[in-house]
């Protein structure tokens, strides 16, 4: 899957789950299960509930995503 196929959307972290997974509520009210991207993991970026994040969603499965950016 190329990067042009992904959907970028913003949301708010609702809760932290085991194995670096997060429950994220999108701006439209839907909830998504998301994991951290490799760059955030390598740079030890901490994500806590309440943080605004940017997600990449696959057009094939809109219930799972990857957190690619944490807003300040």
Curated annotation (Swiss-Prot):
One of its GO terms (cellular component) is cytosol. GO terms for molecular function: ribosome binding; rRNA binding; translation initiation factor activity. The keyword Protein biosynthesis applies. Its main location: cytoplasm. InterPro entries: NA-bd_OB-fold, RNA-binding_domain_S1_IF1, S1_domain, TIF_IF1. It holds the Pfam family eIF-1a. This is Translation initiation factor IF-1. It is found in: Cytoplasm. Residues 1-72 form the S1-like domain. Keywords: Cytoplasm, Initiation factor, Protein biosynthesis, RNA-binding, rRNA-binding. The gene is infA. Signal peptide: none annotated. One of the essential components for the initiation of protein synthesis. Stabilizes the binding of IF-2 and IF-3 on the 30S subunit to which N-formylmethionyl-tRNA(fMet) subsequently binds. Helps modulate mRNA selection, yielding the 30S pre-initiation complex (PIC). Upon addition of the 50S ribosomal subunit IF-1, IF-2 and IF-3 are released leaving the mature 70S translation initiation complex. Belongs to the IF-1 family. It comes from the Bacteria. Component of the 30S ribosomal translation pre-initiation complex which assembles on the 30S ribosome in the order IF-2 and IF-3, IF-1 and N-formylmethionyl-tRNA(fMet); mRNA recruitment can occur at any time during PIC assembly. SUPFAM superfamilies: Nucleic acid-binding proteins (SSF50249). PANTHER family: TRANSLATION INITIATION FACTOR IF-1, CHLOROPLASTIC.
């Amino acid at each position: 899957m190329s990067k042009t196929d992904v959907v970028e959307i913003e949301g708010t972290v609702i809760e932290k789950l085991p194995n670096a997974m997060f429950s994220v509520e999108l701006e439209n009210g839907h909830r998504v299960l998301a994991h951290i991207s490799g760059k955030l993991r390598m740079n030890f970026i901490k994500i806590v509930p309440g943080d605004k994040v940017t997600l990449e969603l696959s057009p094939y499965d809109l219930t799972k995503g990857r957190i690619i950016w944490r807003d300040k």
